[in-house]
UniProtKB/Swiss-Prot annotation:
Positions of the UniProt region annotated as ACP-binding: 239-243
Lineage: superkingdom: Bacteria
EC number(s) on file: 2.3.1.180
Name of protein: Beta-ketoacyl-[acyl-carrier-protein] synthase III
């Protein structure tokens, strides 16, 4: 059985925050932010918009793109680190709001690696033969856990959501190879402070980890698929920082024109990062049926996930 993406959708809130916003209260500048991160702007949800609202909008698009009805979905997995509340989960809320019926629904927390973790998890369920249309959503409202007094992190994060329907696809298409892992010894470098409820990051250590693991994990899944870097049509890394992304691309050994860059428009949107990039490249015509694509993410935990996928239903 070939398991892959049957439907796709993404959503970014309307409100756009440019770098000039931060110049008003932080010792920073558009020039510095752009040079060090590649970020020019990011989308922030309104106060009355929560993660489940972002996830809902992306899910509607994915369901429509797959040509199915909500009642055809037999499981919901939401990757998020910013659920509306500890429970019920965002997936539970989506189940009710979409009208899928009483299907299994759960949130999966692997921070910025969450979308990779959830896609790989969904593949296993479909491969078992017991599930046929699994809604996987990566959604985060990072603006609510961003410390706006911390110059090193305040400028980095945005909000958004992306969704896919994972199920059986045509011969020769779908997920070819994958990897996920974690290193708990690095958890202290990227975490949510239990006292302040805000994100804390040791940027130097996270940078070193990210460059190494994104490049190495991408290389391993390409090799596992019996491919070479020359076979890759598009590389879509987690959009954390342009310098991390460029270093990972170089380690993988692909040309700059084959790497998706959306960090300039969205910032780091955690679990929504990779699907927002997919959305951009679909709209730009850079993703076509039968293209071979490498997806890779890293996040708090520390965690990582990667896959090669042959695009198409």
């Amino acid at each position: 059985m070939n398991v892959g993406i049957k439907g796709f959708g993404a959503y970014a809130p309307e409100k756009i925050i440019d770098n000039a916003y931060f110049e008003q209260f932080l010792d920073t500048s558009d020039e510095w932010i752009s040079k060090m991160t590649g970020i020019k702007e990011r989308h922030w949800a309104d106060d009355d918009q929560d993660t489940s609202d972002l996830a809902y909008e992306a899910s509607l698009k994915a369901i429509a793109d797959a040509g199915i009805q909500p009642e055809d979905i037999d499981m919901i997995i939401v990757a998020t680190a910013t659920g509306d509340m500890p429970f019920p989960t965002v997936a539970n809320m989506l189940q009710e709001r979409l009208g899928t019926g009483k299907v299994a629904s759960m949130d999966q927390l692997a921070a910025c690696s969450g979308f990779m973790y959830s896609m790989i998890t969904a593949k296993q369920y479909v491969q078992s033969g017991d599930y046929h249309n699994i809604l996987v959503v990566g959604a985060d409202k990072l603006s609510k856990i961003t410390d706006l007094t911390d110059r090193s992190t305040a400028v980095l994060f945005g909000d958004g959501a992306g969704a896919v329907i994972i199920g059986e696809v045509s011969d020769g298409r779908g997920i070819i190879s994958y990897e996920m892992g974690s290193d708990g010894t690095g958890g202290k470098h990227l975490y949510l402070d239990k006292d302040t409820g805000k994100l804390k990051m040791n940027g130097r250590e996270v940078f070193k980890f990210a460059v190494r693991i994104m490049g190495d994990a991408s290389t391993r899944v390409v090799e596992k698929a019996n491919l070479t870097s020359d076979d890759i049509d598009l590389f879509i890394p987690h959009q954390a920082n342009i310098r991390i992304m460029e270093s990972a691309r170089e380690r993988l050994g692909i040309s700059k024109d084959k790497m998706s860059v959306s960090v300039n428009k969205y910032g780091n949107t955690s679990a929504a990062s990779i699907p927002l990039s997919i959305d951009q490249e679909l709209k730009n015509g850079k993703i076509k049926d039968d293209d071979t694509i490498v997806l890779v993410g890293f996040g708090g935990g520390l965690t990582w996930g990667a896959m090669t996928i042959k695009w198409g239903k």
